[in-house]
Regions:
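Charged, low-complexity intrinsically disordered terminal segments
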Residues: 1-167
Length: 167
């Protein structure tokens, strides 16, 4: 989903770039292809035409739910949770749920980085487990629930991503 030297680990400031990707097969590929063409046509002077013959022809793969969410304009990413997320984490922990959070050890934006730490302290006090990724830069936006449900995306868990950047 990302194109640039930093995503390949070629920028020394960040080192190894840790992200999460997944392989999608079946009918869901058609939804992604449509979303790509619509986004391309919105951003480019060279318009792509939607032809049925150009679409990926999928063989049925099974019955797994999937949701494709349209994205909005690109912007600088931040990692500052808001009060509602911090409160939700605290409530979950105090209810006996094992909450684990991983954040990068290297800042991309120092102000945002330290603001994140101010929220993390409260989550730690409530009993959440917080890990700091040391092997490079953590860019992944992944949520796992009980090893059965996953969310892999581009949105940060913060006010800008949830309310401003159409993520």
């Amino acid at each position: 989903f990302n194109v640039g030297d930093e995503y390949l680990g070629k920028v020394k400031k960040y080192g190894y770039w840790r992200d999460t990707h997944l392989r999608i097969v079946g009918e869901s590929v058609r939804s992604i292809q449509t979303r790509f063409i619509l986004d391309w046509n919105q951003a480019s002077k060279h318009q792509l035409i939607l032809y049925d013959s150009a679409y990926y022809q999928a063989e049925p793969q099974g019955n797994v739910g999937m949701q494709i969410v349209s994205s909005g304009p690109d912007s600088d990413w931040e990692q500052i949770p808001d009060e509602s997320l911090a409160d939700a984490v605290k409530i979950a922990v105090l209810s006996g749920i094992d909450v684990r959070i991983m954040i990068p050890s290297k800042p991309d934006h120092p102000f945002v980085y330290w603001a994140t730490y101010s929220y993390i302290g409260n989550m730690l006090e409530a009993g959440a487990k917080v890990y700091i990724y040391q092997n490079g830069f953590l860019h992944a936006k992944t949520i796992m629930v009980d090893g059965k449900i996953a969310s892999v995306g581009t949105a940060n868990i913060d006010v800008r991503s949830c309310r401003l950047n159409f993520e």
